[in-house]
Amino acid sequence: MVTLTVELSEELANALAQFVKRVGFSEMRSNAVDDFEAYLIRDALDRVRIGLANAGFSPR
């Protein structure tokens, strides 16, 4: 398990939260070497989204 701690301005945190909300699987797949890696990327971004939501950045 890897734990990441980052410091972001509110502007950056909000922009990142918007990105992880909007990015679709097709973009993930087009940047992955195969489907398996695309699913790993999706799962990792979901954890980032949860972390941002826990910090108060959860766009609708």
Residue positions per predicted region:
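Positively charged, low-complexity terminal tracts
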Residues: 1-7, 11-60
